[in-house]
């Protein structure tokens, strides 16, 4: 039977504190240079407590991705699952929401830069990002488009990838590479015409 102290170590409050401390450490020092002992200090727990909940640094980083996807709802696939009404209006509002949330959250942008920057040395981090964030979103968007027979899409998955890929490219230029002024494009113009390409296939 587990002791009360052990149960307290695994409490939701301590888990949240660990994740907050980990986010702070990863954002300040990147993945490779991040240290568990500094995370423990920031979280106000022992290293042993962290290892009881997260066996290694990779599992801790993956948990942060899951938190990013769920808690902040930056990439919320649930909205796609329960979408109703006009397809064009919904797609634009959905895309606008995603782009705005990314742009308005510096912490998320820094986290994305870490994933991209560390992907060469730690490909498992990039794969975890795709598994926890990109894949669910792509699958949900594919299902949504496939459920709209009036669109007469030849391939819903290709359409979903084109839609998501355009937004990812926009974020990369504007927010990650700091080059929105070099290749300017108004968000409304981009999304209005992107939606037209999707709902009016050639």
Q: Which residues does each predicted region cover?
A:
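Basic, helix-initiating cap at the start of DNA-binding domains
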Residues: 1-45, 52-53, 58-59, 85
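Amphipathic alpha-helical segments that line or abut small-molecule/effector binding pockets
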Residues: 20, 85-104, 109-113, 157, ...
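Short, charged helix-capping/linker segments at alpha-helix termini
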Residues: 32, 150-154
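Amphipathic alpha-helical linker/stalk segments
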Residues: 62-94, 141
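A short secondary-structure junction motif
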Residues: 67-75, 105, 122, 140, ...
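Amphipathic C-terminal alpha-helical segment
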Residues: 100-104, 143, 160-182, 197-202
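Amphipathic alpha-helical segments used for helix-helix packing
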Residues: 102-131, 172-177
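Amphipathic alpha-helical packing segments from all-alpha helical-bundle domains
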Residues: 123-150, 189-192
């Amino acid at each position: 039977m587990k002791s009360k102290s052990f149960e307290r170590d695994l409490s939701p409050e301590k888990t949240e504190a660990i994740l907050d401390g980990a986010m702070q450490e990863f954002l300040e020092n990147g993945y490779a240079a991040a240290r568990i002992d500094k995370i423990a200090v920031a979280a106000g727990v022992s290293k042993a407590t962290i290892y009881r909940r997260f066996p290694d640094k990779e599992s801790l980083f993956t948990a942060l991705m899951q938190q990013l996807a769920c808690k902040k709802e930056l990439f919320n696939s649930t909205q796609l699952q329960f979408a109703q009404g006009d397809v064009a209006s919904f797609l634009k509002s959905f895309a606008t929401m995603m782009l705005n949330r990314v742009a308005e959250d510096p912490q998320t942008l820094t986290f994305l830069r870490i994933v991209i920057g560390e992907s060469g040395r730690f490909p498992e981090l990039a794969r975890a990002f795709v598994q926890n964030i990109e894949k669910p979103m792509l699958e949900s968007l594919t299902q949504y488009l496939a459920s709209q027979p009036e669109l007469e899409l030849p391939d819903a998955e290709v359409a979903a990838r084109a839609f998501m890929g355009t937004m990812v490219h926009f974020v990369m230029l504007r927010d990650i590479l700091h080059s929105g002024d070099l290749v300017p494009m108004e968000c409304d113009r981009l999304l209005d015409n992107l939606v037209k390409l999707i709902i009016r296939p050639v």
